[in-house]
Amino acid sequence: MGGCAGSRRRFSDSEGEETVPEPRLPLLDHQGAHWKNAVGFWLLGLCNNFSYVVMLSAAHDILSHKRTSGNQSHVDPGPTPIPHNSSSRFDCNSVSTAAVLLADILPTLVIKLLAPLGLHLLPYSPRVLVSGICAAGSFVLVAFSHSVGTSLCGVVFASISSGLGEVTFLSLTAFYPRAVISWWSSGTGGAGLLGALSYLGLTQAGLSPQQTLLSMLGIPALLLASYFLLLTSPEAQDPGGEEEAESAARQPLIRTEAPESKPGSSSSLSLRERWTVFKGLLWYIVPLVVVYFAEYFINQGLFELLFFWNTSLSHAQQYRWYQMLYQAGVFASRSSLRCCRIRFTWALALLQCLNLVFLLADVWFGFLPSIYLVFLIILYEGLLGGAAYVNTFHNIALETSDEHREFAMAATCISDTLGISLSGLLALPLHDFLCQLS
């Protein structure tokens, strides 16, 4: 890519005729750097969200915390579970899986709230290193824990890793062509699918949850390798024609912004400029908060209660299947930006709220006759959530100037985390209320 792919210099010979030097090598360099960055951001998205997803997939096991002799923990119950609360019409854990959600999201919320204020002062490399170490620590701590409390501490490490990583890598996209946002989003969707599917598959194959978690320690190493070895230097970026086409169609989010501003550090923005940019972002932040509130209220508040007795799947297995199908929908829609772009993300928020109302009604009245209908609804739920995420960040990338884009990406990160945190806080009392019903 380097500095030679941006423009073709013309030279004049002695007769005044212009000749063009052979562009093939610079073009190949540009294409090679493009694909290295594309793959790099996809892997960063995959590895960054992997531990977060696995902890949510393991939430039922973490809270059940059944043990046998030896060091294997969280043993999968048989296909006919014994209710933890025999007086309730639901098969409830004593603590809602929303507790795992809160441990998995509140540290991320704190990081994202503080990030726009001063995280940019810390270089990217130390942030990535801390993120990788915390991810590895989360797998080890949960795998070897002997209490729910210790396991939740491990979940907190996963939250720190994913939260710090998301703010870091989304801010980093400001120094690369806008196309990397699509690759990052696809990678985060892939983390959901591969994380949930690997946990489901390995436990179904007979591995204990402890062995399954320890087998995933290669993911943090892959994250570090992707950042330090695969990405090209951002100073050498030259977006070329694709960026020019996007800028021509761009509708400025802040009307006074300069259309030709260059990428730069958000540390140069004053507090007044940051507030002005943030107000312009609310059109996208609010619907994303609503989408994530609705879907995680479903995932961590209702999944555990959407239990069907007339199947061969145990309660824990049903929960894992719900998580896997949700993540499959997220992956598909987060990878669809090239063929489907949605500007009005409010529509996605409305549809996700309708999902929440419908499934909450089913938990209360129990009118769905088959678990396979729930499978389809959960897949659809994931499609809506993934589409909201990728289109929100893509729209912001198009509608903010390069000068504001790094700050805008970091500030918008708060949306999903805020929605998830609110859903967890409300899902806890809902769980206690429903589980007391006889």
Swiss-Prot record:
GO MF term (any one): calcium-dependent protein binding
Lipidation (S-farnesyl cysteine): C435
Effect of L253A: Loss of lysosomal targeting. Does not affect interaction with CLN5. Does not affect interaction with CLN5. Loss of lysosomal targeting
Spans within the Lumenal topological domain: 59-127, 173-182, 299-346
Keyword terms, alphabetized: Cell membrane, Cytoplasmic vesicle, Disease variant, Endosome, Glycoprotein, Golgi apparatus, Lipoprotein, Lysosome, Membrane, Methylation, Neurodegeneration, Neuronal ceroid lipofuscinosis, Phosphoprotein, Prenylation, Synapse, Synaptosome, Transmembrane, Transmembrane helix, Transport
Keyword Cell membrane: yes
PTM text: Highly glycosylated.
Induction / repression: Increased by osmotic stress.
InterPro entries named among the record's database cross-references: Battenin_disease_Cln3, Battenin_disease_Cln3_subgr, MFS_trans_sf
Outcome of substituting I254A: Loss of lysosomal targeting. Does not affect interaction with CLN5. Does not affect interaction with CLN5. Loss of lysosomal targeting
Cysteine methyl ester: residues bearing it: C435
Region (Disordered): 1-25, 237-268
Transmembrane segment boundaries: 38-58, 128-148, 152-172, 183-203, 278-298, 347-367
One GO process term, biological-process aspect: regulation of autophagosome maturation
Tissue: Expressed in the cortical brain, pancreas, spleen, and testis with weaker expression in the peripheral nerve (at protein level). Highly expressed in gray matter (at protein level).
Phosphoserine carried by residues: S12, S14
Topology term for the membrane: Multi-pass membrane protein
Record: glycosylation sites: N71, N85, N310
Known disease link: Ceroid lipofuscinosis, neuronal, 3: A form of neuronal ceroid lipofuscinosis. Neuronal ceroid lipofuscinoses are progressive neurodegenerative, lysosomal storage diseases characterized by intracellular accumulation of autofluorescent liposomal material, and clinically by seizures, dementia, visual loss, and/or cerebral atrophy.
Subunit structure: Homooligomer. Interacts with DCTN1, KIF3A, RAB7A and RILP. Interacts with CLN5. May interact with HOOK1. Interacts with KCNIP3; this interaction is disrupted by intracellular increase of calcium level. Interacts with TPP1, CLN6 and CLN8. Interacts with MYH10; this interaction may play a role in regulation of cytoskeleton organization. Interacts with SBDS. Interacts with sodium/potassium-transporting ATPase complex (via ATP1A1) and fodrin heteromer (via SPTAN1); this interaction regulates their localization at the plasma membrane. Interacts with HSPA5.
Domain comment quoted from the record: The C-terminal (153-438) mediates KCNIP3 interaction and the cytoprotective activity. the dileucine motif mediates AP1G1 and AP3D1 interaction.
Protein name, per record: Battenin
Organism: Homo sapiens (Human)
Lineage: Eukaryota, Metazoa, Chordata, Craniata, Vertebrata
